[in-house]
Amino acid sequence: MIKSIRNLLYRPPAMPKSGEDFGDYQTNFVNAIRFTESCGFLVERPDWKPHERLEVEGSFLEPALRAAGVRDLTKAAFQCLKWSHYLAPHIEQQLGRKVWLTIGQIWKEDQALFSPTWNDLRSWSKQGITIEEMHKPGSAGLNLHAWLTVDSGEVIEPTMMTSIATLYPDTYSHFLCAIGWGQPADILSEHKYFPMAVGAEFAECLHSRSQIGLLASNPQELHSVPMAIVFGN
């Protein structure tokens, strides 16, 4: 009862209004867990291990992708939620450490590339996402970004670089099929991550209540592209 009352009374922190407003990623991540809990989902809290960083060589990736049945990374373009959710348990098993699906905003300098609000996420968790919502003026697809957070405080970015390469092949063809990992500020130059919701359960609820399938349960679904989810505002 007390927890239910706390969730009802919970008010999320202020949204960033510029690239200077992001603060500490780990603090924002814990705030995102608190918001997710207020929506009715259970999320394991992090026991941060900042000194146990991901290896620079990324040798964990190939066996994780192989176990996941990934055969064509170009299909990850514009499919951040589906790919991040699908890859999370495979990467977690390969690393032997906690990995969380993370949903939120991503900015380049002072411009939000994907900018869901707290109200958006809470509403989607209760009612799902409609096709009409994915075709709002000023948007072409699902206005959120998804990635993975590791218990070191680092992130793994499975899709953004391939999306950029697909949009701008003349300039960023070298990004195609690339996966990034490391400190949030180091993944992509001048890009910043703002976590807002955490965990597979939250994503699976969005999927089950939405008018379009958002996730994959097998490699065939992972590699299919029913709808391009591209840059929002």
Whereabouts are the PLM-identified features?
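A structural boundary/capping signal
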Residues: 1-233
